From Swiss-Prot:
One BP term from GO: fusion of virus membrane with host plasma membrane
InterPro entries noted in UniProt: Capsid_hemagglutn, Hemagglutn_HA1_a/b_dom_sf, Hemagglutn_influenz_A/B
Signal peptide interval: 1-15
Membrane topology: Single-pass type I membrane protein
UniProt family annotation: Belongs to the influenza viruses hemagglutinin family.
Further information: Major glycoprotein, comprises over 80% of the envelope proteins present in virus particle. The extent of infection into host organism is determined by HA. Influenza viruses bud from the apical surface of polarized epithelial cells (e.g. bronchial epithelial cells) into lumen of lungs and are therefore usually pneumotropic. The reason is that HA is cleaved by tryptase clara which is restricted to lungs. However, HAs of H5 and H7 pantropic avian viruses subtypes can be cleaved by furin and subtilisin-type enzymes, allowing the virus to grow in other organs than lungs.
A Pfam entry, by short name: Hemagglutinin
An annotated GO cellular component: viral envelope
Organism of derivation: Influenza B virus (strain B/Guangdong/55/1989)
Protein name according to UniProt: Hemagglutinin
Subcellular location(s) per record: Virion membrane; Host apical cell membrane
Record PTM: In natural infection, inactive HA is matured into HA1 and HA2 outside the cell by one or more trypsin-like, arginine-specific endoprotease secreted by the bronchial epithelial cells. One identified protease that may be involved in this process is secreted in lungs by club cells.
This protein's record includes keyword Membrane: yes
Amino acid sequence: MKAIIVLLMVVTSNADRICTGITSSNSPHVVKTATQGEVNVTGVIPLTTTPTKSHFANLKGTKTRGKLCPNCLNCTDLDVALARPMCMGIIPSAKASILHEVRPVTSGCFPIMHDRTKIRQLPNLLRGYENIRLSTHNVINAERAPGGPYRLGTSGSCPNVTSRSGFFATMAWAVPRDNKTATNPLTVEVPYICTKGEDQITVWGFHSDKKTQMKNLYGDSNPQKFTSSANGVTTHYVSQIGDFPNQTEDGGLPQSGRIVVDYMVQKPGKTGTIVYQRGVLLPQKVWCASGRSKVIKGSLPLIGEADCLHAKYGGLNKSKPYYTGEHAKAIGNCPIWVKTPLKLANGTKYRPPAKLLKER
């Protein structure tokens, strides 16, 4: 009579096989167990897969955001985040978002000095929220701000639906009307105007140019000082005055000046402040954002649907519970990463035939 041996399913951090079975007579497969080492069994089921790189996809069972504004054609995410004319559309809500613009990108209205602020992070900050909307009202009256009255500057590289010249909807380029003189630092309070308890993302900045242009626009060709403060974070800037080479953005007009753009996050009910001199870009429409969207670095376009979004492999469908290969951030219904392949023995343990006893 054959003895029956039962191998229990064992999972340990040191094991690279999972095994279960009973005695049998043939053994084309070898598995490794925690208690008995290598064991011959008659059949196994692979539990791991090694994915190949593929396109990213929409995550099954949830809304996935690729571009901030899918219907804003020929617009970068920075265009949308700054509310460039012709790039103002609805940002759909999403539980998951793809971070796809990993390098600094430009915005067509005006040459931006990316290296002086964290503005390149603004699209990704917005992408991390589930719900994002642009306010319908301006946060301050820029024309009557301290140091005014101001006229609001525009750029021929920023045409909108009604004019051949415009500017970002999130900022007002404050150019003195009559009082083109130097000024001591001025302060404007930025109220909280979001209505649903959201975070308020307020965009602001300043313009600088060569000395002759600064004198013509503002009456002061010296470097100007700027400070923003909100939610316990204070940032200081001094404008850079110099002869910048003419630069054309997105097929627009050559620009001799540059703008520095920054943002501050205001929590519900909290007021921010901006201290400024000449050349300020005062905040106008603000972003109201709430909820959290899981963010993963990927590439566009999003094609089809997938169970899992993996930073290295793209969209994955969970065909097996484990995977090998590159370990990276993943979101969704994802297989578990393991270092070496796992197998489940569904056959029986091999036992060599017993030797015949000599008759006496």
